[in-house]
Amino acid sequence: MLEIKELYKSFDGVQAVRDFSLALQPGKITSLIGPNGAGKSTVFNLVTGFLPYTQGTIQYNGQSLSGLTPWKIARHGITRTFQNLRLFRKLTVLENVLLGRQNQSGENVLNALFLFSNRSPEYQLQLEVSESLLEFVGLEDKQAELAENLSYGQQKLLSVACCLAAEPKVLLLDEPVSGVQPEMINKLTSILKELVNKQQKTIWLIEHDIDFVLKISDTVIVMDDGVIITHSDPKVIQSNSAILEAYLS
């Protein structure tokens, strides 16, 4: 279980995150919502090692994540996507996922790229896993395409596949359906539900699409000005017009 206690983060004396505490429910989908600047992405950056925190503790399965680099946290079983997609745009779709697999063997990027040029048993194994992930997200026919040539929605799917390549138990998704068409939202909804219901993944996401949030979430956390305002069932959030108006308008 991912457990955060009394987390603080300040930038030049300004508190961006204050007294943030959460025990993430395993095998569930938890959404973190709130206005721009509330501190949501900062929390994700703190949990995944992209920023150091000022005070507090973050533990996963009883082990402290303090001071760990993002790749070490990923090897603990926690991976993430970003609001601004971080793909290797000049590499193919398949190569992007293969690079995600390199965490499993401890290879660096250059070594992983070297694997692409041979047909070793290790390469074949990583190839099969990567192809199955692309099939899972519906990009099996785009393997040879450059990542930059995919539609924005397809790039979102690829980012999920890359996230899954490291075989995580917990996925942190930053605005997974932002800016995509309704049919792609439906596809991503189905993918995330299957990850939880059939693969026992735990998902924590940030999203501004309230309809998507209320439809998919088991728990919704509302955050503003660096603090948690409320933490509740989506039906309770949906019935609270004050919260919806104040934080999602």
Q: Can you say where each PLM-predicted feature lies in the sequence?
A:
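Conserved ABC ATPase "signature" region
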Residues: 110-142, 190-193
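Conserved ABC transporter NBD signature motif
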Residues: 56-64, 76
